[in-house]
From Swiss-Prot:
Cellular component terms per the entry's GO annotation: cytosol
Residues binding ATP: 621-628
Alphabetic keyword roster: ATP-binding, DNA damage, DNA repair, DNA-binding, Nucleotide-binding
DNA repair in keyword set: yes
Xref: SUPFAM superfamilies: DNA repair protein MutS, domain I (SSF55271), DNA repair protein MutS, domain II (SSF53150), DNA repair protein MutS, domain III (SSF48334), P-loop containing nucleoside triphosphate hydrolases (SSF52540)
Name listed for the protein in its UniProt record: DNA mismatch repair protein MutS
InterPro entries (UniProt xref): DNA_mismatch_repair_MutS, DNA_mismatch_repair_MutS-lik_N, DNA_mismatch_repair_MutS/MSH, DNA_mismatch_repair_MutS_C, DNA_mismatch_repair_MutS_clamp, DNA_mismatch_repair_MutS_core, DNA_mismatch_repair_MutS_N, DNA_mismatch_repair_MutS_sf
Entry keyword RNA-binding: no
Physiological role: This protein is involved in the repair of mismatches in DNA. It is possible that it carries out the mismatch recognition step. This protein has a weak ATPase activity.
GO biological process: mismatch repair
Molecular-function GO terms, alphabetical: ATP binding; ATP-dependent DNA damage sensor activity; damaged DNA binding; mismatched DNA binding
Length: 869
């Protein structure tokens, strides 16, 4: 250490306090990085790695740097790579410093705490989430620092908590240090993968410490006043988030003004599997927004509205009155295209007020940000005028909450120029006429520059030296330059400042006096402009709560306009959402598939489900016929209805559903080491435990991951359980290839059979995509194989084997005789079914009362007799 320069010693001392972050060390107009930080940053950023000085052992010190005024894209790239960035600024004016300039870290930028647009997706929240537990009670809190949104909840059990984490989709997660150890480490592994993780020691979760953090952030507020008195574990998670803010932002987040507690009973619950299978916000195949329900429904024109719509999709309502309020607003806007288009046009000019407010409150806003705020506020009176003319209750509420902030708009308009520069310290930000002192300094500056031009002309005339020039540089200031050939003509009052190879440089008392006046004015102008800008920014920050409230109302309005436009353009109907059990859809359509294949006519279908005679629908039919599409569309229509949206149908009667479950596919869990069949059983078990009579269950091909007999048995038992157990008797759509399950409708009054209509023509099949009553008579697997492009030889051979199987011609070990080879000779006549030693089988058969056998019992009996042979 003693061999190092003072600045390098200072760097290492500060770096020791932030070992997990790349330290941006301010040196003049640059942020510099040294040692391992420099090596890592140069690789990620693709910038030149150089070196400075030498260590005591003669080795070079790696170095790289970036201009401080254009650091945002570099920081964004590092954060995107999962790195933390500690911003170390000069804490005093270098001109005033005695010795090395004091420096300190002013903030640490992490993936979950970015606020600059370069690091953010406009229509996605950027959440920092904390999770902790007290026994089986899991507390969860999450914060979007860029908008100030801060929410907390408690959940029963780790799986419910992890499902909520997946839904929230945080960019960074805070966990207690115990989550590093088994078994919790393994249980959360799939959720934390590819996310930035920070572990806190147990003392951070001390209740008293967390209460102090909450009180400090929210001006003395208590758990009771924040509505969190019944969420003690969630409050510990909130404390962890606030502790992280103290660590990284010096606790400075004035726009985070409240905590919003919520309970899972307030919303229709959707587990991770259901969200994925229904492709609510991203497609299964590529994880993209386009092709998802969100991609279809999002016609918002503001970033705030886009984020709000995603929340509405992820958290459908359980409150009928709130649903009806949204429906009323959508209907009014749908029926008033002129108003709707006017609102959309006005909203399109509103910037992201939530994130502008965040940067303003965190003192990170630029003059461009204030200009964007001014532009947005200028549109609010016209928006209010449009909304005020509407009659729907929710639109009236939004109108009351939209605050034009006239005084702030006027302040910014008078203070900030129309098109301010990006760099604050360059000046040119404050408008003429706003501040008298600034106007006077600008006049001096302009007059001084004019004086220089006049003085040059005067001196040329006085000396007769036509090549005389008055110039300026940062070292000498203003000077008069005369070539060597003309030195003899200079007056006596010229004072030599510098000798060059071909010229001499001079000053005069008059030039020096004006230099001090002009340059002093320019320095004072920049300092005064920055000070005035800070005052305006602070005035805007003081209105943070009003800005946030207006931003939220504008986001809601944007979503309502978007949904009304979608309903109008797509011919959606207003569903009748009710407290009963009947789910009736007339001519329902899958919203996304209908949109993606708009050139073709989507075949609509009716649906009837209830908790009585139509409680469980068995759907049979071939692959590709449309079973999965039909079931998913029922789930999506139910979800859209509880969002308050209109739905793709001619008519819809939708009951409030507490949960939607889906059991489709297994690709998600195979990477976790679970077999396809194990995934099926785990998800099925979760459904059977969690479903209620108010739930909607979608089951697609239960039991296909094991042997036929096992699969049929499990599928049959699952269907029976969902029908017979009244606590878990959810409204269920059950697609299957096991035609044996159609027999359930004979013995269970709440089970009905439906199939996908198919027509055969020239040994080919035509999918009619229509759901009709009754079970399917064939599975058409070979025809589907032909459509998929299997070689004709394989198709022909499959037909032969199928005929053989259907005739029951089996050889030893149950192998179809023809399946062992086409040239196998036909079997010799069999004289007796039983040999001399088959008395046991004969006796077993005598015990059977055929008339009383169910199809499932018959299948199990055949399997038993087969093992006895």
């Amino acid at each position: 250490m003693s061999e190092m320069t003072p600045m390098m010693r200072q760097f290492l001392e500060i770096k020791a306090e932030h070992p997990d972050a790349i330290l941006f060390f301010r040196c003049g107009d640059f942020y510099e990085m040294f040692l391992d930080d420099a090596v890592k940053a140069s690789r990620i950023l693709g910038i030149t790695l150089t070196s400075r000085n030498k260590n005591a052992d003669g080795s070079e010190v790696p170095l790289c740097g970036i201009p401080y005024h254009s650091c945002a894209p570099y920081i964004a790239k590092l954060v995107e790579a999962g790195e933390k960035v500690a911003i170390c600024e000069q804490a005093e004016d270098p001109k005033q410093a005695k010795g090395i300039v004091k420096r300190e870290v002013v903030k640490v930028i992490t993936p979950g705490l970015v606020i600059e647009d370069a690091s953010l997706s406009p229509k996605e929240n950027n959440y920092l989430l904390a999770l902790c537990c007290d026994g089986e009670c899991y507390g969860l809190s999450y914060l979007d620092l860029s908008t100030g949104e801060f929410r907390v909840t408690e959940l029963d059990g780790l799986q419910a908590a992890l499902a909520e984490v997946t839904c929230i989709g945080p960019r960074e997660i805070i966990l207690p240090v115990c989550f590093r150890e088994e078994p919790k480490r393994k249980e959360v592994a799939h959720v934390i993968v590819d996310r930035s993780i920070t572990y806190f020691e147990e003392w951070v979760y001390d209740p008293d410490y967390c209460k102090r953090l909450v009180a400090n952030q929210f001006k003395g507020a208590t758990a009771e006043s924040l509505g969190c008195d019944r969420l003690p574990t969630a409050l510990l998670a909130a404390g962890a988030v606030l502790h992280y803010l103290v660590d990284t932002q010096k606790g400075h987040a004035p726009h985070v003004t409240c905590i919003t507690p919520y309970n899972e009973s307030e919303h229709l619950l959707l587990d991770e599997s259901t969200r994925r299978n229904l492709e609510l916000t991203a497609t299964l195949s590529e994880g993209k927004r386009k092709g998802s329900l969100l991609g279809l429904m999002d016609r918002t024109v503001t970033a705030m509205g886009g984020r709000k719509l995603k929340q509405w999709i992820n958290y459908p309502l359980m409150d009928l009155k709130k649903i009806w309020l949204r429906q009323d607003a959508i209907q009014e806007l749908m029926e008033a295209p002129g108003t709707r288009e006017a609102m959309k046009s006005l909203l399109a000019g509103v910037y992201d007020l939530e994130r502008l407010n965040g940067r303003i409150s965190l003192a990170s806003a630029s003059a461009k940000d204030l200009s964007a705020l001014r532009s947005s506020l200028s549109r609010l009176p016209a928006i209010k005028e449009q909304v005020a003319a509407c009659g729907a209750g929710l639109l009236k509420e939004l109108d009351a909450g939209i605050d034009p902030l006239d005084e702030l708009s006027d302040l910014i308009s008078s203070a900030i120029v129309d098109d301010p520069p990006f760099v604050l310290r360059d000046g040119g930000i404050i408008a003429d006429g706003y501040n008298q002192e600034l106007d006077e300094l600008r006049a001096i500056s302009r007059e001084g520059k004019g004086f220089i031009a006049r003085l040059e002309a005067q001196e040329k005339g006085r000396t007769g030296i036509s090549s005389l020039k008055i110039r300026y540089n940062k070292v000498f200031g203003y000077y008069i330059e005369v070539t060597k050939a003309n030195v003899s003509a200079i007056p006596d009052d010229y004072i030599r400042r510098q000798t060059l190879a071909n010229a001499e440089r001079y000053i005069t008392p008059e030039l020096k006096e004006y230099e001090e006046k002009v340059l002093g004015a320019e320095d004072r102008i920049k300092d005064l402009e920055f000070s005035l800008f800070q005052e305006v920014r602070e005035a805007a920050a003081a209105q943070g709560e009003r800005i946030a409230r207006s931003a939220d109302r504008l986001a809601c309005l944007d979503v309502l306009v978007s949904l009304s436009e979608l309903a109008h353009d797509k011919g959606y109907c207003r569903p009748e959402v009710h407290e009963g059990s009947e789910l009736s859809i007339t001519e329902g359509r899958h919203p996304v598939i209908e949109d993606m294949h708009s050139a073709e006519r989507f075949v609509p279908n009716d649906t009837l489900l209830d908790n009585g005679e139509n409680q469980l629908i068995i759907i049979t039919g071939p692959n590709m016929a449309g079973k999965s599409t039909f079931m998913r569309q029922v789930a999506l229509i139910s979800l859209m209805a509880q969002m308050g949206s209109f739905v793709p149908a001619d008519k819809a009667l939708i009951p409030l559903v507490d949960r939607i479950f889906t059991r489709v596919g297994a690709s998600d869990n195979l990477a976790r080491g679970h077999s396809t069949f194990m995934v099926e059983m785990m998800e099925s078990a979760a459904i059977l435990r969690g479903a209620t009579a108010r739930s909607l269950v979608i089951l697609d091909e239960i039991g296909r991951g094991t042997s036929t007999f096992d699969g049929v048995s499990i599928a049959w038992a699952v269907a029976e359980f969902l029908h017979d157990n009244k606590i878990h008797a959810a409204k269920t759509l059950f697609a299957t290839h096991y035609h044996e399950l159609t027999e359930l409708a004979v013995t269970r009054p709440g089970i009905k059979n439906f199939n996908i209509a198919v027509r055969e023509w020239n040994e080919r099949i035509i999918f009619l995509r229509k759901i009709v009553p009754g079970g399917a008579s064939h599975s058409y697997g070979i025809q589907v194989a032909r459509l998929a492009g299997l070689p004709q030889a394989v198709i022909d051979r499959a037909k032969e084997i199928l005929i053989n199987l259907e005739k029951g011609e089996y050889g030893e070990g149950g192998v179809p005789r023809l399946a062992r080879g086409k040239k196998t000779p036909p079997p010799s006549p069999q004289l007796s079914l039983f040999g001399a030693g088959d008395d046991q089988i004969r006796e077993r058969l005598k015990e059977i009362e055929v008339a009383l056998l169910t199809p499932l019992e018959a299948l199990n009996l055949v399997d038993e007799l087969k093992r006895m042979i």
